[in-house]
Protein backbone atom coordinates (compact mmCIF):
# COMPACT_ATOMS: atom_id res chain seq x y z
CA UNK A 1 0.00 0.00 0.00
CA UNK A 2 1.42 3.40 -1.00
CA UNK A 3 0.93 6.17 1.54
CA UNK A 4 2.18 9.73 1.26
CA UNK A 5 2.26 10.43 4.99
CA UNK A 6 5.40 11.62 6.82
CA UNK A 7 7.36 8.57 8.04
CA UNK A 8 9.32 8.35 11.27
CA UNK A 9 13.09 8.09 10.95
CA UNK A 10 14.85 4.87 12.06
CA UNK A 11 16.33 6.78 15.01
CA UNK A 12 12.87 7.96 16.07
CA UNK A 13 11.55 4.43 15.79
CA UNK A 14 14.33 2.98 17.95
CA UNK A 15 14.07 5.67 20.62
CA UNK A 16 10.28 5.52 20.56
CA UNK A 17 10.36 1.77 21.12
CA UNK A 18 12.69 2.25 24.09
CA UNK A 19 10.29 4.84 25.54
CA UNK A 20 7.34 2.49 25.08
CA UNK A 21 9.19 -0.34 26.84
CA UNK A 22 10.08 1.94 29.77
CA UNK A 23 6.45 3.07 30.02
CA UNK A 24 5.25 -0.53 30.05
CA UNK A 25 7.77 -1.44 32.73
CA UNK A 26 6.56 1.46 34.88
CA UNK A 27 2.92 0.47 34.43
CA UNK A 28 3.69 -3.16 35.32
CA UNK A 29 5.48 -2.11 38.50
CA UNK A 30 2.97 0.60 39.42
CA UNK A 31 -0.30 -0.33 37.63
CA UNK A 32 -2.31 2.20 39.64
CA UNK A 33 -0.73 5.54 40.56
CA UNK A 34 -1.62 6.60 44.14
CA UNK A 35 -2.68 10.19 43.40
CA UNK A 36 -3.60 12.59 40.64
CA UNK A 37 -0.25 14.36 41.12
CA UNK A 38 1.63 11.11 40.54
CA UNK A 39 -0.46 10.36 37.45
CA UNK A 40 0.07 13.87 36.12
CA UNK A 41 3.82 13.57 36.71
CA UNK A 42 3.97 10.20 34.95
CA UNK A 43 2.19 11.50 31.84
CA UNK A 44 4.11 14.80 31.88
CA UNK A 45 7.41 12.89 31.72
CA UNK A 46 6.06 10.61 28.97
CA UNK A 47 4.77 13.65 27.07
CA UNK A 48 8.11 15.46 27.28
CA UNK A 49 9.99 12.35 26.18
CA UNK A 50 7.60 11.73 23.31
CA UNK A 51 7.79 15.30 22.02
CA UNK A 52 11.59 15.23 22.22
CA UNK A 53 11.97 11.87 20.48
CA UNK A 54 9.47 12.57 17.70
CA UNK A 55 10.18 16.30 17.27
CA UNK A 56 11.33 15.87 13.63
CA UNK A 57 8.28 13.77 12.79
CA UNK A 58 5.90 16.23 14.46
CA UNK A 59 7.55 19.28 12.88
CA UNK A 60 7.40 17.70 9.43
CA UNK A 61 3.77 16.67 9.94
CA UNK A 62 2.85 20.25 10.87
CA UNK A 63 4.95 22.01 8.21
CA UNK A 64 4.09 19.79 5.27
CA UNK A 65 0.28 19.63 5.18
CA UNK A 66 -0.44 16.67 2.92
CA UNK A 67 -4.10 16.85 3.89
CA UNK A 68 -6.26 20.02 4.02
CA UNK A 69 -7.12 21.24 7.51
CA UNK A 70 -10.83 20.86 6.78
CA UNK A 71 -10.34 17.16 6.01
CA UNK A 72 -8.32 16.66 9.20
CA UNK A 73 -11.06 18.31 11.28
CA UNK A 74 -13.81 16.35 9.55
CA UNK A 75 -12.14 12.97 10.00
CA UNK A 76 -11.14 13.77 13.58
CA UNK A 77 -14.77 14.32 14.48
CA UNK A 78 -15.87 11.36 12.37
CA UNK A 79 -13.25 9.14 14.00
CA UNK A 80 -14.50 10.05 17.47
CA UNK A 81 -18.14 9.44 16.53
CA UNK A 82 -17.38 6.09 14.89
CA UNK A 83 -15.21 4.98 17.82
CA UNK A 84 -17.96 5.93 20.27
CA UNK A 85 -20.67 4.12 18.31
CA UNK A 86 -18.47 1.07 17.73
CA UNK A 87 -17.71 0.90 21.44
CA UNK A 88 -21.41 1.07 22.30
CA UNK A 89 -22.19 -1.67 19.79
CA UNK A 90 -19.37 -3.86 21.10
CA UNK A 91 -20.54 -3.50 24.70
CA UNK A 92 -24.16 -4.21 23.73
CA UNK A 93 -23.16 -7.34 21.82
CA UNK A 94 -21.03 -8.59 24.69
CA UNK A 95 -23.80 -7.92 27.19
CA UNK A 96 -26.33 -9.72 24.98
CA UNK A 97 -24.29 -12.81 24.07
CA UNK A 98 -22.08 -13.43 27.09
CA UNK A 99 -23.36 -15.32 30.14
CA UNK A 100 -24.77 -13.19 32.93
CA UNK A 101 -21.95 -14.03 35.35
CA UNK A 102 -19.51 -12.05 33.19
CA UNK A 103 -21.23 -8.85 34.28
CA UNK A 104 -23.01 -9.73 37.52
CA UNK A 105 -22.39 -11.66 40.72
CA UNK A 106 -24.49 -12.25 43.82
CA UNK A 107 -24.17 -8.63 44.98
CA UNK A 108 -24.99 -6.99 41.64
CA UNK A 109 -22.94 -5.57 38.74
CA UNK A 110 -19.23 -6.26 39.15
CA UNK A 111 -17.78 -5.25 35.80
CA UNK A 112 -16.59 -1.69 35.26
CA UNK A 113 -13.94 0.10 33.23
CA UNK A 114 -11.06 0.52 35.66
CA UNK A 115 -9.49 3.38 33.66
CA UNK A 116 -12.69 5.42 33.86
CA UNK A 117 -13.10 4.61 37.54
CA UNK A 118 -9.55 5.72 38.26
CA UNK A 119 -10.02 8.88 36.19
CA UNK A 120 -13.18 9.69 38.15
CA UNK A 121 -11.18 9.45 41.37
CA UNK A 122 -8.47 11.72 39.99
CA UNK A 123 -11.05 14.25 38.78
CA UNK A 124 -12.65 14.41 42.22
CA UNK A 125 -9.21 14.98 43.77
CA UNK A 126 -8.07 17.72 41.36
CA UNK A 127 -10.10 18.28 38.23
CA UNK A 128 -7.64 20.62 36.48
CA UNK A 129 -4.69 18.24 36.85
CA UNK A 130 -6.83 15.31 35.73
CA UNK A 131 -8.09 17.27 32.72
CA UNK A 132 -4.55 18.39 31.88
CA UNK A 133 -3.01 14.96 31.46
CA UNK A 134 -6.19 13.39 30.06
CA UNK A 135 -6.84 15.95 27.33
CA UNK A 136 -3.29 16.96 26.39
CA UNK A 137 -0.66 14.44 27.49
CA UNK A 138 -2.42 11.10 26.97
CA UNK A 139 -3.69 11.68 23.39
CA UNK A 140 -0.33 12.92 22.10
CA UNK A 141 1.70 10.16 23.77
CA UNK A 142 -0.63 7.31 22.84
CA UNK A 143 -1.19 8.39 19.24
CA UNK A 144 2.50 8.90 18.54
CA UNK A 145 3.42 5.54 20.08
CA UNK A 146 0.56 3.26 19.05
CA UNK A 147 -0.62 4.82 15.79
CA UNK A 148 2.50 6.71 14.70
CA UNK A 149 5.22 4.28 15.78
CA UNK A 150 3.67 0.80 15.77
CA UNK A 151 0.94 1.17 13.14
CA UNK A 152 2.92 3.64 11.02
CA UNK A 153 6.00 1.41 10.92
CA UNK A 154 4.01 -1.57 9.63
CA UNK A 155 1.35 0.00 7.41
CA UNK A 156 3.58 0.39 4.34
CA UNK A 157 4.56 -3.28 4.50
CA UNK A 158 1.30 -4.98 5.44
CA UNK A 159 -1.90 -3.07 6.24
CA UNK A 160 -3.83 -5.96 7.92
CA UNK A 161 -0.77 -6.78 10.04
CA UNK A 162 -0.46 -3.13 11.05
CA UNK A 163 -4.08 -3.10 12.23
CA UNK A 164 -3.65 -6.41 14.06
CA UNK A 165 -0.40 -5.64 15.88
CA UNK A 166 -1.31 -2.09 16.89
CA UNK A 167 -4.74 -3.18 18.11
CA UNK A 168 -3.37 -6.04 20.21
CA UNK A 169 -0.60 -3.91 21.74
CA UNK A 170 -2.89 -0.93 22.45
CA UNK A 171 -5.66 -3.02 24.01
CA UNK A 172 -3.22 -5.14 26.02
CA UNK A 173 -1.43 -2.13 27.49
CA UNK A 174 -4.66 -0.42 28.52
CA UNK A 175 -5.79 -3.58 30.33
CA UNK A 176 -2.57 -3.87 32.36
CA UNK A 177 -4.16 -2.37 35.52
CA UNK A 178 -6.58 -5.33 35.76
CA UNK A 179 -4.10 -8.10 35.01
CA UNK A 180 -3.11 -8.62 38.64
CA UNK A 181 -5.58 -10.86 40.45
CA UNK A 182 -8.31 -10.66 37.81
CA UNK A 183 -9.90 -13.60 36.03
CA UNK A 184 -9.27 -14.17 32.34
CA UNK A 185 -12.86 -13.37 31.38
CA UNK A 186 -12.64 -10.06 33.24
CA UNK A 187 -9.37 -9.20 31.47
CA UNK A 188 -10.86 -10.23 28.11
CA UNK A 189 -13.83 -7.89 28.58
CA UNK A 190 -11.52 -4.95 29.21
CA UNK A 191 -9.36 -5.96 26.25
CA UNK A 192 -12.29 -6.04 23.83
CA UNK A 193 -13.52 -2.62 24.99
CA UNK A 194 -10.49 -0.90 23.48
CA UNK A 195 -10.54 -2.62 20.09
CA UNK A 196 -12.99 -0.21 18.36
CA UNK A 197 -11.05 2.89 19.41
CA UNK A 198 -7.77 1.63 17.99
CA UNK A 199 -9.36 0.44 14.75
CA UNK A 200 -11.15 3.74 14.13
CA UNK A 201 -8.11 5.87 14.95
CA UNK A 202 -5.90 3.75 12.68
CA UNK A 203 -8.49 4.10 9.93
CA UNK A 204 -8.59 7.91 10.08
CA UNK A 205 -4.77 7.93 10.13
CA UNK A 206 -4.76 5.96 6.87
CA UNK A 207 -7.49 8.09 5.29
CA UNK A 208 -5.87 11.46 6.07
CA UNK A 209 -2.22 10.35 6.07
CA UNK A 210 -1.32 12.58 9.03
CA UNK A 211 -0.88 11.70 12.71
CA UNK A 212 -2.54 15.01 13.61
CA UNK A 213 -5.96 13.54 12.80
CA UNK A 214 -6.01 10.70 15.37
CA UNK A 215 -4.37 13.02 17.92
CA UNK A 216 -7.21 15.51 17.53
CA UNK A 217 -9.84 12.75 17.61
CA UNK A 218 -8.31 11.39 20.81
CA UNK A 219 -8.31 14.87 22.35
CA UNK A 220 -12.01 15.26 21.52
CA UNK A 221 -12.82 11.85 23.02
CA UNK A 222 -10.91 12.46 26.25
CA UNK A 223 -12.19 16.03 26.63
CA UNK A 224 -15.80 14.89 26.41
CA UNK A 225 -15.06 12.03 28.81
CA UNK A 226 -13.50 14.28 31.46
CA UNK A 227 -16.32 16.82 31.12
CA UNK A 228 -18.83 14.15 32.14
CA UNK A 229 -16.94 13.87 35.44
CA UNK A 230 -17.12 17.60 36.19
Enumerate the predicted regions with their spans.
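N-terminal, membrane-interfacial amphipathic/helix-forming hydrophobic leader that caps
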Residues: 1-88, 96, 164, 179, ...
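Short, functional N-terminal and low-complexity linear motifs
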Residues: 14-19, 114-120, 165-171
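Interfacial loop-to-helix junctions that mark the boundaries of transmembrane helices
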Residues: 36-40, 118-122, 154
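Juxtamembrane helix-loop-helix connectors linking adjacent transmembrane helices
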Residues: 61-138
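Transmembrane helix-loop-helix hairpins at the membrane interface
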Residues: 125-230
Amino acid sequence: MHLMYIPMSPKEQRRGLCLLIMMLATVLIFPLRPSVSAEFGFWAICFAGTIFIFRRFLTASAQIPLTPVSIVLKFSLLGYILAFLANLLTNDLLFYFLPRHFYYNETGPHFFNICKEQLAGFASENFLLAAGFTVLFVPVVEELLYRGLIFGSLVRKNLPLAYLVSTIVYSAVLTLPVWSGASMDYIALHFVQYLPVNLMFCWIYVRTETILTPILAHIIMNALCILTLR
